[in-house]
Amino acid sequence: MVWGKICWFSQRAGWTVFAESQISLSCSLCLHSGDQEAQNPNLVSQLCGVFLQNETNETIHMQMSMAVGQQALPLNIIAPKAVLVSLCGVLLNGTVFWLLCCGATNPYMVYILHLVAADVIYLCCSAVGFLQVTLLTYHGVVFFIPDFLAILSPFSFEVCLCLLVAISTERCVCVLFPIWYRCHRPKYTSNVVCTLIWGLPFCINIVKSLFLTYWKHVKACVIFLKLSGLFHAILSLVMCVSSLTLLIRFLCCSQQQKATRVYAVVQISAPMFLLWALPLSVAPLITDFKMFVTTSYLISLFLIINSSANPIIYFFVGSLRKKRLKESLRVILQRALADKPEVGRNKKAAGIDPMEQPHSTQHVENLLPREHRVDVET
């Protein structure tokens, strides 16, 4: 079975770069497997990720070398670049985290702060996984990754997905119900939502790890993986609906409502994530092992690029239409995540000078009569 090879490929070798696509592939496998899992003990051990403990390092080294040799070209091209992009992404996201750590003044900054932290975790796990592949491909060196990284990688990916859904949904509520959002929104909603987002995927991945590694219950394993795949599909659908609603609202009411920079950040980040993660929907349709390995590498590389590009989006939106060259990164970042329209810039873009408005102080003073003193000589 293809799944048995993939389970070994990602779990036993410690290649966390395939973790995000295992759930999607398992859903398609369950449609074909039926009740054969209970009749085939070998398939049971492969499906649940239960591996023999008495394998020697030489055997594992030989198996990994054979698996890598089947996809030498994608490894030579993708793995080193993925390591480099991951390290650059860690540096960029780390800078954003440091700038926002003490300056989260609105709900969107709180969400972005947690999103950056999840991106850093995911990029670190991906860098370690691809570094293992690179060393094995070019130098034949094998080192084993701790087991907790196999949980940490999909956990951080799911946190990123949930945070993007929360950001899109909150922005959608803010645009559709502005009065309720400004007056009745609970103050600590962002902190509570972020806490739940970190806790829910953590519990899901812990239970998934128990199903796959210790309990050896195939039926429960299959049901759980189906539910996990459904959970991912629902989150992606909610993000699509929120982004589309924001876009339609902006196109229909662009004259009445002034767009903020954080709106631009949301409208760029959410579709970019969906675009880079789009190949995930293709993975369940692949039955060839070699093709699945190549697709898994590409999916991982795309997700790494997306996580690394988020800070570039923040700084680009924050510095857009600003002619000041000497501005700190903190000011640019705070401007990008500000939830207030820039009145002066919008009026200037419309050809209106704010100082010439009828309600401005200068205009009122010009309308007042001036006093004239006349010195009368006696």
From Swiss-Prot:
It is found in: Cell membrane. Gene3D superfamilies: Rhodopsin 7-helix transmembrane proteins. Residues 102-109, 170-191, 249-264, 318-378 are cytoplasmic. GO terms for molecular function: G protein-coupled receptor activity. It comes from the Eukaryota. Glycans are attached at residues 54, 57. Residues 1-77, 137-154, 208-221, 287-297 are extracellular. Coiled coil: none annotated. One of its GO terms (cellular component) is nucleoplasm. Keywords: Cell membrane, G-protein coupled receptor, Glycoprotein, Membrane, Receptor, Transducer, Transmembrane, Transmembrane helix. Residues 368-378 have a biased composition (Basic and acidic residues). The keyword Transferase does not apply. Residues 344-378 are annotated as: Disordered. The chain crosses the membrane at residues 78-101, 110-136, 155-169, 192-207, 222-248, 265-286, 298-317. GO terms for biological process: G protein-coupled receptor signaling pathway. This is Mas-related G-protein coupled receptor MRG. The lineage of its organism: Eukaryota, Metazoa, Chordata, Craniata, Vertebrata.
